[in-house]
Amino acid sequence: SLDTSNLIAEEVAQDKPAEVENLEEIPTTDELMQNPDVREQPVADSDDSDLTVVSSGAYWTIYRNTANGEYSMRMFGNVPSSRPTAWNSYLKSIKHIEIEEATLTGSFASYFRNNVFTVLESVRIERSNLSGVTSFEMAFYSPTLQKVIIRDNDYPTAPSLRTTEYMFGYTHKLTELDVSGLDASAVTNMNCMFNYCSVLEELDVSNFDTSSVTTMRDMFGSSGKLEKLDVSNFDTSSVTTMQAMFYGCTSLEELDVSNFDTNSVTNMSYMFYNCAGLEELDVSNFDTSSVTNMYGTFVGCNSLEELDVSNFDTSSVTTMQAMFNACRALEKLDVSNFDTSSVTTMQAMFENCTGLGELDVSNFDTSSVTTMAYMFDGCTSLEELDLSNFDTSSVTTMAYMFQNCTALKSLYLDNFTTPKTMTGMFTGTTALTYLFASHNLRAFDGLANTRWYDEKNWVQFSNYKELQMYHEYQREPTGYRKGIFLSLTMDAMGGQFEEMEEQKVQNKVSGEYWEEMLPVKEGHYFDGWYLDQNFTNKFDFSLPATVSATIYAKWVENYTVIIPASISLNEASELKVEGINRGSKTLSVGLNYEETTISESNKLTLSNTADTTVQCLAPLSWDGSETNPKNAILTLAPGSEITEG
């Protein structure tokens, strides 16, 4: 069912019109039977032997069916729009009216209404001249009518019919309607013409000439059983309002309005309200340049999977309230070109668009908007909303604006200001992990009461109140992330980093990777990061961050053995340096040289018999002692490169 509880009421012209005339108390059928003055006489001009004439006049005859006791009336000849007083005794009894081979003249407004013919069930107008009829306004406005046939009629002169407003309004029991014999070419007003034809399943208006019509407000409104409706040939070039035109046509599965000329239309509010059965609707050619009101235009079209409004000119629109409310099946909606500079209300605009996975409103001009309450309420598939360009300086209420956006992960509110009302603004945003908010937005009502942190300054908050208090003191837009951030403290253990710090602290979110930083220490070389100061558990930077930790730099002291020598090598010779470690320290062996003594064509490479990949200052270790020395030999081969160490 359609939830419209958050919509502000707007008149859709559903109220019943006032009575048009006062009638004297009319006797019932039982009273007629006991009134000797109106006893029926056998009918002479009928083929039905059960019918007897009870009263007649110049253009009418009233019958009673002796088999079932029902009263009926037949009209013919020149039929005026007035009702003779002779009918008064039968108005509460006549169930069927037939008008054949007649000429009708004047206004037949409210002619067959239920406050006149209180039990009327059927009306048939056939083979008659209707050129002189000026009005059928509310003519068949009756909850008792079940069948109306208007067909095979003549228009020897130009039709005079100007209004069919409420012509079949509130015909709750009407199951059969034929208007093929109605010439509507001169009609200007079709407001509510078929309003509340609640059980009517078929209606053929495919041949209607609507070229003169200026208003179609609520024309088919609340005709919830209509399964087919062909309006593809409607000429709507003169129409100024289509408000609620198809309001509540819940059973329509197809509706072709692709040829509608909407150049003059100013009001499209509720136009397709609750057309819940429509799976397709082509409005891509609509000219909406004159439209000012799009209140609830597509509200409740919950079967529409696609809706192309990308070419809508919305420069004149002042209200978009509930425009797409409850379009539950829509997965995409392109409103990126909407000109919203004149819009004052966007309340519930996308409420309950549960299928929308993405929505680009980044270009919306919201400088004139005063209400954004419920704007995205119930958009359960949206994961990100960029409202960074929204100007909310005129907004007074954002109540429940993002309520139950349960999939929303990121929200950008760069330019938001604090409105008068923001009750429940973030209620139900359970998946929200990132919020970038203006420093002028002072509260986050309904935000998850859990841990958050300032992503820039790495300040941790244990609950929502701490976050809000912190944000009140910010002087620039700030980004907040849900959860706990992790810290890695890197202790240089006597060494230093580039900026002379002895410690470095980096912060990451769980799952991210730590950055390895290398300190330096004079007289030592760096031998890695460890999780303990005994250097038994080496830290692995290839693993994602899962916990906060402190790591320690391991240093190895350098010892230098100086061997003064002048070295001259040819291609066949080599230099060997032997050393004996008589202690427990690691021995590094290097070669210092004067740049001018090394030929560019005969460079040397320092190699190690134990590890040929080690160059220069290659660490050599001995486990021996004076009684059990172990020699390590450093070999300089021809063609090797020596680097200073």
For each feature predicted by the language model, list its residue ranges.
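Asparagine-centered strand-capping/turn motif at beta-strand->loop junctions
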Residues: 579-583, 608
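Structural signature of tandem-repeat unit edges
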Residues: 70-78, 92-104, 117-134, 143-162, ...
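Serine/threonine-rich, repeat-prone extracellular segments and beta-strand-based repeat modules
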Residues: 464-480, 531-552, 626, 633-637
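Short acidic, flexible loop segments centered on an aromatic residue
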Residues: 589-598, 618
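Secondary-structure capping and domain/repeat boundary segments
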Residues: 484-559
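N-terminal capping/linker segments that flank leucine-rich repeat
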Residues: 2-132, 146-161, 179-183, 413-417, ...
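Structural beta-strand segments of beta-rich domains
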Residues: 71, 571-575
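Solvent-exposed, conformationally flexible loop/turn segments
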Residues: 500-514, 546-548, 564-572, 609-613, ...
